From Swiss-Prot:
This protein's record includes keyword Transferase: yes
This enzyme's EC code(s): 3.6.4.-, 3.4.22.-, 2.7.7.48
GO biological process, one term: DNA-templated transcription
Annotated binding of ATP, by residue: G494, K495, S496, R497, T498, G499, K500, S501
Effect the entry attributes to changing Q947H: Strongly decreased efficiency of cleavage between VPg and 3C-like protease. Complete loss of infectivity
Record-given protein name: RNA1 polyprotein
Location of O-(5'-phospho-RNA)-serine modifications: S920
């Protein structure tokens, strides 16, 4: 090592000076060496600016700053000398230049980082001097300013604790001779607890909780080794170092986090980082001398690894303010790869090797193992360059991890097992075989080219390739017939010489690369060849110059059968290829022709055109020259699609790479569609062998062997001369020969081969595969035997007579199998034995286990010996990499610790200790822990009980605005402010740094709240802070006037006031209200408020003489100002126990109410009927009236229409005056009783467990959202009108109520939302200037700032209820009408999320959108049955009122986490959701405050309830499992063990038998009851039990489960619901007969699902008993059957339109139009024409025109003169025409308003225009009838026209009867 070139005397001085360290040396002896003048001179020499950097030591900017400061440099050198003296185990002597330039510089440069800068160095120095000299270093202010750091204020005890831990751990690890992980961790735990007890006794109880962690760390080592499997058996040392390093580092970070939360540490300073960069590095240096080869490089590498670990671990526990570090093994490995990239670039370039950049590594590596493999490869190259030796372990590891050889071997083993179980390979399995084969060949090539790979690994790969090739040969010629996926077909079409063939070949190559397939996976098909010679189920089939020549059959005709999902046997030339079926996955075609040839003999051109999934029309760009090296450079690709009878251009692509991306995307979409289409068929499909009998197999063998000398007859026994050879295969050193005749008689013997071994081997393979295929696909083999094929094909289980001598399972199980085994025929056993020998099946071992066992010991011996000689730094670095990929158990616990926040365990210790001068009691560090374990409800006395002679106004203010905030033993007074905010004392709340679960106690109610310190807003020049959160209960906005917001204007200098406080009496257990008369002075001078280190100064305050006591802070000062009592100040401090000080109210901004609704309310002085969830707060002002339904719309039908069916349902009670109300329930009010369901919300849930459950659900959402990229808000137009053609984006219902307060402006005939929109009924928009439009704009502008004040109307639901809910105990359900603008904004923010949930119902629990008529019901049943036969069918009590704000806040966070977006959008989502849980409800003339539940009129009610339902079940599942100490793996396996589906409050829970001892109905019922949730049996609501039921006994959505076949389940509706439809009909929008007929059709359809026989009998009864219904009015059974067949092909929700389309006779005719131009409109007569608004702008009408707008939403007041808006109700079965009554009144009647306007216009020489949107047929008919009625058209013309109409559509058959005037002159 060279030295700086300085004066010779200085260099000589340094070379002679040494420093010596001995074990156990005293501090004085060390100081004697480092305090000499010579040593100080050496330090000055080291600090000289001209000094040259020594090789291997990097002097960063921070290091240079240390060298420039003599004091810091000397102190740090001495501190390092102290540190080294602790680490030596034997006497060591260093030259001073070596000590300074190498050891000290290396250590300090690692200690000083860019992130923490000098903090660790200063702490390190403090610790060393504190430990060795009991002296505390105080850094001078100028030094701190020079280093730009803040002084640390760490207690001595904590400093010593941390120092002891840092120095002890590596020392102990270094001294552990046997490297026992258990010994290291056990000792570490004991030492840790000892240090805590000695130095920080107050923290001992926290550490006792932490000590539970060490019990698990030992398990992580074993689990990691098991995870990595056979390969790491020989490198346990490496895994020990890796896991121990990560685990201890995490433990220390957790300790530090706890100490910070407890207030022992002011801020974190990276204890784990110090441990890694000092302890681990020092321990790794032991016995690795400084003169060793590569010492500097090794230590730099280890430091690099330590820095990466520290970044991940510290970043997990202490994330940055802006960048939240993602702590995971992926981040660790990516960081390590990036650091090694920079580190290795210079060291490896000399040998011609460079490391891949980290971004390239991340791109190329598809998984964690691949990334680790790349890193180990770099490490291998580094060792070769640095130390000069080759390591086979790293060479093997880089290959095994980089290529995931272990996963490759397991996949091969799985494929072989599947082949044994089925005797064939499916389409997907064949694809997997080819992918694995190509990967194996690539690994073989890579291993041989790189060198250094162990022979055992190479042989293992070769064995896998050989067995894959055998499996490929076996499966590629199979003829098993079954369902297959339709191939994805691409047609490259274009003119000749455009490069189509080249393009097709290149696309094929890119597809092969994408799927990892080799070049032999393509079959080039010549349509002229009648045979498919050489076809081996290749994934790709190419057809070049398709249809270029005429063939028979034609090329187009051949495509019909190829591009299908039906099995298609091919015509093969070779006998051995007989029966192969086509099942390639891709068919690529190049052709010059776009259309089908007339000579193709294809009867349906559409069938051919629909089989071309993508048409790529290839052309050349004339502006670009052809480039032979890049033929695609001048190509243009036009993507065509055949749709609606023509070719449509989808897009035009000019770049080849974009084309490939497009084709791959379409390919993936096609595959997903096929999987969905065939999912059920794949499960239930039976596959047929093309061999009808075993004789056919034997005949095939005879034909194969004909002409070849395969078998030598002389070697056959005499009795077997007439038999055929089945096989002759080698086994255990001899051959097993099996012969069989046509009667299946078998002769077997062991001996020599009976023919040519090589040829006979191929012959035997084909015969065995054919025979095995026939055996498994036939019914000959017992199904019990087929279920145990893995054991039955094992040759070790047979003796030489082929008798089965093995054992299946345990003895008791095997005994049950004996009869089945005995029933097997000998030819069965011969085939099973032979296939087992052929496939190398070994006893009780998979193929994977056999192969691994063959190499395991050899690798263990080799790796153990090699790793033993590695330098320790390499061991530690490599161990960290292995732990990152193998330590899954550690990482799981680590993520749980990181993700838990500070948790409730830390909540009570968050505040810290401070002075008692401000009169708030200091938070107790253990308050939250005490609360957590002693959660006993506190008794209290309400304020009205206190003996007070105070003015009632002051009491009312206290009741509305004062509250207490409670956590643990801390009880604070706060002031509630409108807008979900409160004011509180700054000196207390500034010390709360972590989230807390607190309780808010107000007058008459209390609730829990998750306090988040991030929502505290500092108020300058005030001792108050403002806290705001959406989940706080709001106080009435009328309370705003109860505060004095402008003290300068309103307050005099001296005034009288009331001092009011309400503190908790600990001894009495109640809140005690007190008051005092005070004289208040307004002070305008500085007041200093101190609390320990806390100091705050305010320039203005209120002062009064009052003997205030502790905990008075937060008390109210109320004065009579401006004619009313107001809060003028909040008590914040006291002076010497005599003078009180209050802070003036800050100038807050009021939060506007979007609805401005409270102007209609008269608020009560105090709330009434108070409960946990609701309270009556006001009444409606005089004259304010809310119109609600008072009479039912349900009409009872005549008795003969009841069809002798029972009915126990009647219309519900809507008004208190209903005479049906029983006498004992007199006074029952349905509107007010409806709000009572919100009176008792559920109890608060444990936030940690709730967060864990939310993360589980959120993870499922993210899994479903991989391909879902649209979660943004939709436009207002889309929120109103929906999106045409987009699933689950329907328009907003306009017929429903507009909500409060807009409902108050209704006129007599107006109703619903229609009056606030305008448009043509297809596309509408808000009418500007209306109350809804204004409220919408206000809500949009403010939703992100605060929770809107929501007012709903509770409206009794007009429905049929059981008689007991009317006559016995009235119980009418209510639904909530919410304001229109609120619903619109919610739809904008959440519509895409709702679409996502509904579209993924097949994967999620929420089943909103399910179609019970489709196969969805069958899939739901299969999903339940998959978990087992134990199903809980549950029913909640008052579910609508259970949801708490705590859970709603969590749901809002989940949705925001999934949907993302800007902060403004996230805040708006949260506020809109939270408004539901804290709103006002109008119940007739009273107003109630509701603080829980979901209003039924909320657009997302059913979605949110479904999510809440799922959270409840998941929460109590984990709670119950952990309470019973179930294995954690089961706790975390909800989705594996439980099948859950929800739909609002409806659910089904299928429970796996494994967890029934822990989780059943009884335990679930009890657990829910503890939280205030009542759940009962859904089938028997009176039962006290919640038993398991079979799925067939359960119901869901009032539908049961009836299994029709192995795959089809029906969902018949409860008959009681059906019969009630015959007794009562809703006549709101139609005549009674029409409504009844609609119900009859629905009942008929539902009865068909019960059974076709019942439907037939019901149909006949209807026709017999209801005389006016004809057979043509009812669908036939054939139509019903077709309806269900159609529905089972659908995936979307059912709707009435679909039902009408398939069951209504009137709609089965062809569509009607007068002419092709009729859809644009037509000329009816000279005076009357019709126009389609899609093509005509009525606003541009002429002065000589009169316009009628039919069924649009344009208000009449907004239309120009001469325009008239007409709306009708469509009649059922009338082809779109209005009801009979409407037509009679408006068309047939001559003096109707419409006819008058027409006649007036005609007399004025004006033209009349009838306008509508899209469907013009009804308007055309109305126009024609109007023309003939007003004598503008001859009757002969109208007669002929209408007759033609009726011929085309049966729906209009009623026209002659109703409009006789149009058919004859009357």
């Amino acid at each position: 090592m060279g030295l700086p070139e300085y004066e010779a005397d200085s260099e000589a001085l340094l070379s002679q000076l040494t420093i010596e360290f001995t074990p156990g040396m005293t501090v004085s002896s060390l100081l004697a060496q480092v305090t000499t003048n010579d040593f100080h001179s050496a330090i000055e020499f080291f600090a000289a600016e001209k000094a040259v950097d020594i090789e291997g030591v990097h002097y960063n900017a921070y290091m240079q700053q240390i060298r420039k400061n003599p004091s810091l440099l000397r102190i740090s050198v001495v501190a390092y000398a102290f540190h080294v003296s602790d680490m030596v185990a034997e006497t060591m002597s260093y030259d001073v230049y070596e000590f300074l330039y190498k050891h000290y510089a290396l250590f300090i440069s690692n200690l000083v980082t860019r992130t923490l800068r000098f903090k660790e160095l200063l702490l390190f120095c403090k610790q060393q001097f504190l430990e060795k000299m009991q002296a505390s270093i105080v850094w001078a202010p100028e030094l701190e300013q020079y280093l730009q750091v803040e002084g640390d204020a760490v207690a001595q005890g904590v400093s010593q604790l941390l120092y002891k831990m840092v120095t002890w751990v590596p020392t102990f690890v270094r001294g552990a001779v046997d490297w026992s992980v258990d010994a290291i961790l056990v000792s570490f735990r004991k030492h840790f607890e000892k240090m805590v007890q000695e130095y920080v006794p107050m923290a001992h109880r926290v550490c006792s909780w932490l000590s539970q962690l060490w019990d698990k760390i030992v398990q992580w080592i074993s689990q990691a080794s098991e995870t990595m499997g056979w390969f790491l058996d020989g490198c346990r040392d490496l895994m020990t170092w890796g896991i121990a390093t990560l685990a201890t580092c995490s433990a220390l970070s957790l300790v530090e986090k706890l100490l910070v939360a407890m207030g022992f540490l002011v801020e974190p300073f990276g204890l784990s980082g110090i441990f890694l960069r000092t302890g681990v590095v020092a321990a790794a240096c032991y016995n690795y001398g400084t003169n060793s080869k590569g010492f500097a490089e090794m230590m730099a590498l280890l430091s690099l690894a330590a820095n990466c670990v520290s970044t991940v671990i510290v970043g997990g526990f202490f994330p940055g303010e802006k960048d939240n570090a993602q702590s995971s093994p992926v981040i660790l490995l990516e960081g390590l790869a990036g650091q090694m990239q920079n580190f290795c670039e210079t060291t490896l370039v000399s040998v011609g090797k460079t490391c891949t950049a980290v971004n390239a590594i991340s791109t190329c590596c598809g998984n964690l193992k691949a990334l680790a493999g790349r890193i180990l490869g770099m490490l291998r190259d580094f060792i070769w360059k640095t130390l000069g030796f080759e390591t086979r372990f790293l060479a093997d590891a880089s290959l095994l991890f980089g290529e995931d050889v272990d996963g490759w071997l397991k996949a091969i083993s799985d494929l072989r097992d599947q082949f044994i179980a089925k005797s064939y390979c499916s389409q997907d399995e064949m694809m997997q075989i080819l992918v694995l084969l190509e990967k194996g060949r690539q690994m073989r090539k890579s291993g041989l080219s790189k060198g250094g790979i162990s022979p055992a690994i190479i042989n293992l790969i070769l064995k896998g390739i050989n067995d894959l090739e055998q499996l490929n040969r076996s499966c590629s010629v199979q003829g098993v017939r079954g369902v297959r996926k339709m191939p994805f077909t691409i047609f490259f079409q274009g003119k000749s010489r455009t490069g189509k063939s080249l393009l097709m070949s290149q696309v094929t190559k890119d597809f092969q690369d994408h799927y990892g397939l080799g070049g032999e996976t393509v079959y080039s098909r010549n349509p002229c060849d009648q045979y498919w010679s050489g076809y081996r189920r290749q994934p790709f089939v190419l057809m070049d110059d398709f249809a270029a020549v005429v063939t028979e059959p034609s090329a187009e005709a051949q495509m019909i059968n190829l591009i299908s999902s039906a099995p298609y046997p091919l015509n093969m030339a070779g006998l051995e290829e007989k029966g192969i079926c086509f099942d390639s996955q891709f068919v690529f075609v190049s052709t010059n022709f776009l259309e089908v040839s007339p000579e193709a003999k294809v009867r349906d051109d559409e069938a051919f055109k629909n089989r071309r999934h993508v048409i790529v029309q290839v052309s050349n760009d004339p502006a670009k020259a052809y480039d032979a090296a890049n033929f695609a450079s001048n190509q243009i690709y036009t993507i065509l699609a055949w749709k609606d009878g023509r070719y449509n251009t989808v897009c035009v692509i000019e770049d080849y790479d974009e084309l490939v991306a497009y084709l791959l995307t379409r390919s993936q979409q096609h595959a997903e569609e096929q999987e969905k289409n065939l999912a059920n068929m794949m499960k239930s499909a039976t596959f047929e062998s093309h061999f009808k009998s075993l004789v056919e197999v034997l005949e095939l063998g005879s034909m194969i062997s004909a002409g070849f000398d395969i078998i030598r007859p002389e070697k056959l026994p005499s009795e077997a001369k007439e038999k055929r050879v089945l096989y002759s295969i080698p086994y255990n050193g001899e051959y097993c020969n099996a012969l069989i005749d046509d009667n299946y008689n078998v002769t077997c013997w062991f001996g020599e081969c009976v023919g040519n071994p090589e040829q006979l081997s191929k012959y035997s393979e084909k015969m065995l595969l054919g025979a095995y295929e026939f055996l498994l696909c036939s019914e000959s083999l017992n199904v019990v035997i087929q279920a145990h094929l893995k054991e039955m094909v094992c040759p070790h289980h047979y003796d030489k007579e082929l008798n089965f001598i093995g054992k299946i399972g345990e003895t008791y199980y095997h005994n049950q199998m004996v009869s089945n085994i005995g029933s097997m025929q000998k030819w069965h056993r011969a085939i099973l034995f032979g296939i087992g020998v052929l496939l190398g099946k070994e006893k009780e071992k998979t193929w994977y286990q056999v192969q691994v066992a063959n190499v395991k010991q050899a690798l263990y011996d080799m790796y153990t010996k090699e790793i033993r000689d590695w330098p320790m730094p390499i061991k530690v670095t490599c161990g960290i990499v292995l732990a990152a990929i193998g330590g899954s158990a550690f990482w799981k616990v680590f993520q749980q610790l990181v993700g838990s926040g500070n948790g409730p365990v830390l909540m009570g210790v968050a505040a810290g200790a401070f002075s008692a001068e401000p009169q708030s009691r200091k938070p107790n560090r253990f308050d939250m822990q005490q609360y957590r374990y002693n959660n006993v409800p506190l008794k209290r006395r309400v304020w009205a009980d206190a003996q007070m002679s105070l003015d009632q106004s002051s009491v009312a203010i206290m009741s509305k605005c004062r509250a207490n905030l409670v956590f643990g033993g801390t009880n604070l007074q706060i002031v509630m402010v409108p807008g979900r905010r409160f004011l509180a004392c700054k000196h207390f709340f500034t010390h709360i740094k972590t989230k807390l679960r607190v309780e808010i106690v107000m007058d008459g109610r209390r609730y829990y709240h998750q306090f988040d310190p991030a929502n505290i807003y500092d108020i300058p020049d005030s001792e108050l802070v403002l806290y705001s959160h959406p989940s706080l209960e709001d106080v009435s906005h009328s309370c705003w006037d109860l505060f004095c917001w402008d003290p300068d204007k309103e307050l005099p200098s001296v005034f009288g006031a009331d001092f009011l406080s309400c503190k908790y009496n600990k001894f009495g257990g109640f809140y005690e209200a007190q008051y005092a008369d005070i004289k208040v002075r307004t002070k305008k001078e500085c007041l200093t408020i101190q609390s320990g280190n806390y100091v705050n100064k305010v320039s203005r305050y209120l002062e009064y003489e009052a003997p205030t006591i502790p905990e008075d802070c937060g008390s109210l000062v109320i004065a009579h100002i401006g004619g009313k009592h107001k809060i003028v100040g909040v008590h914040v401090a006291g002076i010497q126990g005599k003078i009180g000080c209050a802070s003036l109210l800050p100038p807050l901004e009021p939060i506007a109410q979007a609805q401005g609704a409270e102007e209609y309310f008269d608020f009560l002085p105090a709330e009434e009927n108070v409960s946990s969830g609701v309270a009556m707060v006001a009444g409606l002002k005089q004259g304010v009236y809310i119109p609600l339904p008072t009479k039912t719309a349900l009409v009872e039908t005549p008795s003969e229409w009841h069809l002798d069916t029972p009915c126990d349902k009647v219309p519900s009670i809507l008004v208190p005056t209903d005479p049906r109300i029983p006498a004992q329930h007199e006074g029952y009010d349905p509107a007010k009783s409806g709000v009572s369901k919100y009176s008792q919300p559920m109890s608060a849930l444990d936030p940690e467990l709730l967060g864990e459950v939310a993360n589980d659900v959120l993870e499922l959402w993210h899994d479903c959202a991989v391909d879902w990229d649209d979660f943004g808000e939709v436009s207002l137009e889309e929120a109103l009108n929906g999106c045409e053609g987009v699933e689950y984006m329907e328009r907003i219902p306009l017929a429903t109520s507009e909500g409060f307060p807009h409902i108050l402006s209704r006129n007599g005939k107006e109703k619903g939302k229609r009056r606030f929109v305008q448009g043509d009924d297809c596309v509408v928009s808000l009418i500007p200037g209306t109350t809804v439009a204004k409220a919408y704009e206000e809500l949009e502008a403010s939703a992100h700032r605060f929770v809107p004040a929501l007012v709903g109307i509770e409206c009794p639901k007009d429905e049929k209820l059981p008689m007991r809910k009317v006559f016995d105990k009235p119980k009418t359900r209510c639904f909530t009408i919410l304001p229109m603008e609120y619903n619109l904004v919610v739809r904008r923010k959440f519509l895409n999320f709702v679409r996502f949930i509904m579209a993924n119902r097949h994967r999620l629990s929420c089943q909103v959108g399910i179609n019970p008529y489709s196969m969805e019901w069958s899939r739901l049943a299969a999903r339940m049955k998959e978990k087992g036969n134990d199903v809980l069918c549950c029913d909640y009590s008052s579910f609508d009122g259970l949801l708490s704000k705590q859970v709603m806040d969590v749901i809002a966070s989940m949705i925001n986490e999934l949907c993302g977006g800007e902060d403004q959008l996230k805040n708006a989502r949260r506020n809109l959701l939270m408004a539901c849980c804290s709103r006002l409800a109008i119940c007739k003339n009273t107003v109630w405050r509701v603080e829980c539940g979901i209003p039924s009129g909320f657009p997302m009610t059913v979605i949110v309830n479904s999510i809440f339902n799922e959270i409840l079940i998941r929460y109590h599942y984990k709670k119950l499992m952990r309470e019973q100490q179930a294995p954690e793996l089961m706790v975390q396996s909800f989705d594996k063990l439980i099948g859950l589906v929800t739909y609002g409050d409806d659910n089904l829970i299928s429970v796996n038998a494994v967890v029934t001892p822990y989780f059943d109905g009884k335990k679930l019922k009890q657990s829910l009851a503890q939280g205030g949730v009542t759940i009962t049996d859904g089938k028997d609501k009176t039962s006290l039990e919640l038993p398991f039921r079979r799925l067939e006994e359960c119901d869901f959505l009032k539908r049961t489960f009836v299994q029709r076949s192995s795959t089809i389940w029906d969902a018949p509706e409860d008959k009681a619901s059906l019969w009630s439809q015959l007794h009562y009909v809703n006549c709101n929008n139609c005549e009674k007969e029409v409504a009844y007929l609609t119900n009859v059709v629905n009942v008929l359809r539902e009865l068909y699902m019960h059974s076709p026989r019942e439907a037939t009998e019901f149909r006949r009864k209807v026709l017999k008993k209801v005389s006016w219904i004809t057979s043509g009015d009812l669908p036939t059974l054939a139509q019903l059957q077709e309806f269900y067949e159609y529905q089972r092909q659908q995936g979307g929700a059912d709707n009435n339109d679909t039902c009408d389309l398939l069951t209504s006779v009137d709609l089965l005719g062809p569509p009607l139009s007068f002419e092709k131009e009729a859809m644009h409109g037509c000329k009816v007569s000279e005076e009357i024409v019709t126009k389609n608004l899609a093509y005509y702008d009525f606003k541009r009408k002429g002065e000589d025109e009169v316009v009628f707008l039919f069924n649009t939403l344009y208000p009449q007041s907004s239309l120009p003169d001469g325009c008239h808006s007409v709306t009708w109700s469509q009649g059922s079965g009338r082809g779109g025409l209005p009801t009979q009554s409407w037509m009679s009144y408006n068309i047939s009647r001559k003096d109707s308003n419409i006819n008058k306007i027409i006649r007036t216009a005609v007399s004025s020489k004006k033209r009349v225009i009838f306008c509508a949107r899209d469907n013009m047929v009804p308007v055309n008919i109305v126009a024609l009838l109007c023309a003939v009625r007003n004598k503008l058209m001859p009757t002969a013309v109208s007669n002929a026209t209408l007759v033609k109409v009726m011929e085309n559509a049966k729906a209009f058959k009623f026209l002659p009867e109703e409009f006789n005037f149009a058919f004859s002159d009357v």
